[in-house]
Amino acid sequence: VTAAQDLVPLPEDPLTEVAAAVLGDGHHVVLDLLDVVRHHDGPPVDVVRAGDDLLPRLAHENALDQALLMARQVLRAGGLFVAAVPELDKLGRLRPTAPPPKVTGRGAERQVTVQLWDWAADGESYALEVVRLVRGAETWEVANTVATRHRVLSPEQISASLTDAGFGTVQRLSPAECGHPLPVWVAVAPA
C-alpha cells in the first residue's frame, strides 16, 4: 500500500488484518506511515500502518515523534495506528549478531533473508544489514542489500511516544495474539 488514492487492504498483511479485526468488516483505507507526508492534506484514513523496523529506524533518525504526530493527524476519529516493533531492549547487553535466517519459497523460487546486527557499545542502538539471497543458475546470488541504523525501543518508550502523539487507547499485542512474528502496537485516534 503506497498511495492514498489506490489504497486496498493487503489480505496477507498481518498488520492490516489486525486493523480489520479491530475495525470490523468493510473497506478500510490503509496508509503506510512513510506515505503520511504525501497524504497530509488528503481526507482522513482509517488505518496508518508501520512495518517491522520502521519505528526504531525513525527513532534513530530523531524523526519518530514527528512521524507519529503526522500519523495521528491523518487518521479519522476512531482510526488506528498499527505497528510491528521488535523488542530488543533486553538483548542490548547480550548484543547478538544475527537472528536466524528467514527462508521463503521452494526449489528454484527459494529465497533466504539474513540480518546482521552491529551493536553500539552502550547497547542502545545497532546497525542493521539485510541481505536477500536468491537461487542463481548454479549458486546463490545476492538479490539486494539494505543497511540502516536503529534505536532500541522499550515497550514503555513505545507506549509513551504513542500517548505523547495524541493517541487515546494504546495496546501491545503479543505475536500469539496478532499472528505477526513481532509484537504489534495498536493505538486509537480519539474522537
Q: Could you say what each language-model-derived stretch is?
A:
Residues 24, 28-47:
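Class I SAM-dependent methyltransferase SAM/SAH-binding core
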Residues 6-29:
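Conserved alpha-helix/loop element of class I SAM-dependent methyltransferases that forms part
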Residues 85-155:
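SAM-dependent methyltransferase
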